[in-house]
From Swiss-Prot:
Binds 1 Mg(2+) ion per subunit. The magnesium ion binds only when substrate is bound. Binds 1 Mn(2+) ion per subunit. SUPFAM superfamilies: Nudix. Belongs to the IPP isomerase type 1 family. Mn(2+) binds at residues 27, 34, 71, 119, 121. One of its GO terms (biological process) is isoprenoid biosynthetic process. Its EC number is 5.3.3.2. Residues 32-171 form the Nudix hydrolase domain. Keywords: Cytoplasm, Isomerase, Isoprene biosynthesis, Magnesium, Manganese, Metal-binding. Signal peptide: none annotated. Pathway: Isoprenoid biosynthesis; dimethylallyl diphosphate biosynthesis; dimethylallyl diphosphate from isopentenyl diphosphate: step 1/1. This is Isopentenyl-diphosphate Delta-isomerase. Catalyzes the 1,3-allylic rearrangement of the homoallylic substrate isopentenyl (IPP) to its highly electrophilic allylic isomer, dimethylallyl diphosphate (DMAPP).
Amino acid sequence: MTNEEELVVLADEEGNAIGTAPKATVHTTDTPLHFAFSSYILNPRGELLVTRRALSKKTWPGVWTNSMCGHPAPDETNADAIRRRGVSELGLDFGSFLDIQVVLDDYRYRAEDSSGIVEWEICPVHLVRLAVGEFVEPLPDEVEEFAWEEPQKVFDAVDATPFVFSPWMVDQLSHPELRQAILEAFDPEA
């Protein structure tokens, strides 16, 4: 499915779905509130996948961010959307996902990038665990580069240089419960 075909589910302030719009037309200087998801993907050792957004991205090109974000299609659960985007964006197999857990169910944010494009999303944050032996092969149109890092190193980098990371990642990681969930999954002995 291309951006031109992909639909985004629009929302009202109370979090109710109120319609859809083509993804290609939604992100502007006057972006309507819509549903999205954000995910932090961990390998079996608990290392965190961080990605650098492709330079061709409309918003925040070249910025380091969490593992993967996206938009659920109409009538699609966030878990199914995460699997779909994991396949299409990161080159994972549909069966790669051991566990998908919601950590910040009510997360929402509004941010404006330097070009004036606005992100305004109701965006539950998920922790995703991958099966042993899974490899990431990101699409170049989505991901410029990626790294698997110890979670505390990522937290330290975000705290020291927040301007290098997406505003939603910085904001999400300001929630102690997300950091704790990620740290609890880290097992360097695995």
